[in-house]
Amino acid sequence: MRETQVNIDSEIGALNAVMIHRPGREIENMTPASAPDVLYDDILNLQLAEREHDQLTGVLRRVAAVYEFEDLLRETLADERMKVLLIDELVSLYGCEELAEELNGTENAELAAQLFQGTPMRKDSLEKFLSPLRHAIPPLPNAFFTRDAVMAVNERVIIGSMAFKARHAEALLLKSIFKYHNEISSDGFYYDGTASASQ
């Protein structure tokens, strides 16, 4: 991968690079009961979503460099300092600080996948045993809408202030990539919406 400089100065100009996320197990980890919590009316058909996404990706690859969100996250997690900061933000957001040590010890590719698919909740207390939730850090079935949480204007990035908690983790993951990935460079952030989400 060569270094990519963020530089968007037109809404209609040639597309040089795009970030995508292929739908995966996070779709299968939704249940009819949890679908409304992650802003869906119904369960998606994963095979259909994958097929349609692959068609779109095939078209995009003809005209632009295509970067996969999960791959960029895995590469970003190689920065141990960033990995600790990101995990601290996520466990704080979801109130599962007891998982921080385990997540920090997880291999980067596995952790990147897990952050999209969801981190299962340990049913190690009566409260958790009785909880209808299956995940301590929920799956991110909206992650393939990468344009929702981040925008670029010229050489700087805007990290969205997501209206729903179900989308906050996406913004945190994208912020980490644009701040710490050693081959994606920008001139910083115009706005970091994750700062207001964590308050």
Where are these regions (language model features)?
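The feature marks the mature, well-folded catalytic cores of soluble enzymes
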Residues: 1-199
